[in-house]
Amino acid sequence: TVFYLFNFKFMADKMFLPVEHKVMAAVAQDTGDAADLVIAVERNGEARAYPIELIGYHHQVLDTIGGEAVMITYCTVCRTGRAFSPVVNGAPETFRLVGMDHFNAMFQDNRTGSWWRQVNGECVAGPLKGTLLAEVPCSQMTRGAFTRFHQQGLVMQPDPAFTKEYEGLKDYDEGTMVSSLEGRDTASWQAKSWVVGTMHKGLSRAYDWNYLMRTGSIIDTLAGDSILISVNGVDFDSRR
């Protein structure tokens, strides 16, 4: 008898496993580093924060915030954090990581096998091609900033089952980890340089992170509207 296990170890959903024990702590009890970056989501008066060095490994976390189901996602290769409603055609859906396309994480829904881009929630292959997941507004800020803005908020804690995996992303926030995929080009406008992306009325534009950090703000016009991009250099809290 011959068994073939080719590529099993390198399948995305085997390399990056879902959370087993999701624990949320009140900000008063949270002992994490105030400088850690988080993705923050607020729904119906309830705010929750998800440290990037945790969800960066899992790539997605399903949660309920303010009575709403939310799928919080993060791609460590392109540094994109997005949140979506995991409801497809009126029914709750679950997803698994299947790989990446154009350096962005790709998910597959469990009901139809369709493939969805993490960067914008667009289905690009399968029976649901062309469908978009409903976006849930989210913000990136430090743990400390979240605590100041949301004193009744909750913060996701490390899952003890993945301590070793989280350790591999310990330098990710600062952009100092050595990796061809997750590493950072510190110069501007290189393949792995940091940018702030803005989408408005169907138009998209990217702004150089280094320039924004030097100036603190950028004023521009997009789709005929004036926009202001500003950053808090202490908390890495960007506002658009």
Q: What are the language-model segments listed below?
A:
Residues 1-240:
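Mid-to-C-terminal functional-domain signal that highlights helix-capping/loop sites
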